[in-house]
């Protein structure tokens, strides 16, 4: 295999899946410095063609960025070497998954598109979609061998299928972290929030077939007029509109509702932000999710703040919106 991971080498995905794992497995690994769309939007596909890359590992945000530049760009390159296109870092929304299958796998390749879920703390994937499994839109996959994952309530009771709750891991697994360096009590906290389990801090749903949907961080859940709404749900609704390439939402304090929603939307090429489009997007969210999830305001910035690995930094958007300290920006994409 010729393996291309688009992460920054300083992140756990980078040093684990650019350096350690490929070399341990005897795989040729390709890595480059800079954003995945620099110096031009087609650079990723140019590299796949030039080096006959067989496996690509990237973030869903990168897929949505590729979508922004249209379906025709990847078709200009020979991508027949691709056999696996996999994502991690945040939920892979159905539109992005379908685009990858339609545009990448419909471009002369037989590539399998897969999602997976893990954290820095777990050291490697815990949920995933193997090539022998059917990929399901917006689902990270099933618990991988050696991992006992469950969706539970605050007391640790297992939730029924298709009911949201906290994602926990019940037993130690081969690649888990064993402590927080210099702060063992902090490590113990994650094993004490839910009895007899490691609490990941993510909210998830498990269906009747054992497929997990990771909705987002527990602290990314908005509380609008007493309704708990996942940021990923609102972002997914926005991205499902044909004019939208990427979206990020935050909660703002509201004296009446507790919080209201502000959305930041990156439009696809050929679309321009306007009050008319804002109204159309609000109507679209109302149709998809209901009136309670409609953003109070939609902004159309030129770009969203991201880490070098492609994750949107929502805390920065919120800090800027509320006039707070933006904190550590050392991982910010240049």
Predicted feature residues:
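Conserved AMP-binding/adenylation subdomain of ANL enzymes
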Residues: 1-5, 9-54, 68-69
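Gly/Ser/Thr-rich phosphate-binding loop
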Residues: 1-3, 20, 24-27, 54-58, ...
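AMP-binding/adenylate-forming catalytic core of the ANL superfamily
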Residues: 49, 56, 173-174, 178-179, ...
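Acidic-histidine catalytic/liganding microenvironments
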Residues: 69, 184, 194, 241-242
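Glycine-centered tight turns that cap/initiate beta-strands
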Residues: 81, 146, 243-246, 291, ...
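Active-site glycine-centered loops adjacent to acidic/histidine catalytic or metal-binding residues
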Residues: 89, 118, 141, 202, ...
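Conserved ATP/PPi-binding loop(s) of AMP-dependent carboxylate-activating enzymes
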Residues: 142-146, 157-190, 229, 325, ...
């Amino acid at each position: 295999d010729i393996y291309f991971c688009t992460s920054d080498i300083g992140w756990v995905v980078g040093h684990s899946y650019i350096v350690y794992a490929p070399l341990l497995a005897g795989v040729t690994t390709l890595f480059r410095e800079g954003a995945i769309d620099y110096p031009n939007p087609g650079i990723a596909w140019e590299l796949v063609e030039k080096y006959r890359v067989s496996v690509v590992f990237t973030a869903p945000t990168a897929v949505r960025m590729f979508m922004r530049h249209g379906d025709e760009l990847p078709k200009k390159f020979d991508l027949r070497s691709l056999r696996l296109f996999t994502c991690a870092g945040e939920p892979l929304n159905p539109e992005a998954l379908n685009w990858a299958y339609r545009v990448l796998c419909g471009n002369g390749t037989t590539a399998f598109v897969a999602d997976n879920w893990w954290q820095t703390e777990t050291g490697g994937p815990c949920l995933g979609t193997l090539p022998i499994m059917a990929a399901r839109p917006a689902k990270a996959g099933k618990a991988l061998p050696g991992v006992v994952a469950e969706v539970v309530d605050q007391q640790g009771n297992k939730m029924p299928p298709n009911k949201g709750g906290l994602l926990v891991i019940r037993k130690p697994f081969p690649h888990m972290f064993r402590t927080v360096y210099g702060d063992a009590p902090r490590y113990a906290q994650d094993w004490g929030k839910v009895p007899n389990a490691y609490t990941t801090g993510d909210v998830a749903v498990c269906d009747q077939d054992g497929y997990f949907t990771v909705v987002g961080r527990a602290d990314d859940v908005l509380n609008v007029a007493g309704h708990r709404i996942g940021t990923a749900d609102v972002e997914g609704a926005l991205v499902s509109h044909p004019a939208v390439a990427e979206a990020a939402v935050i909660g703002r304090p509201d004296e009446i509702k507790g919080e209201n929603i502000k959305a930041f939307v990156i439009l696809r090429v050929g679309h321009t932000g306007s009050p008319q489009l804002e109204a159309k997007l609000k109507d679209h969210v109302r149709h998809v999710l209901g009136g309670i999830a409609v953003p109070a305001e939609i902004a159309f910035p030129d770009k969203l703040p991201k880490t070098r690995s492609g994750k949107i930094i929502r805390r920065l958007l919120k800090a800027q919106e509320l006039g707070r300290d933006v904190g550590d920006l050392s991982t910010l994409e240049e």
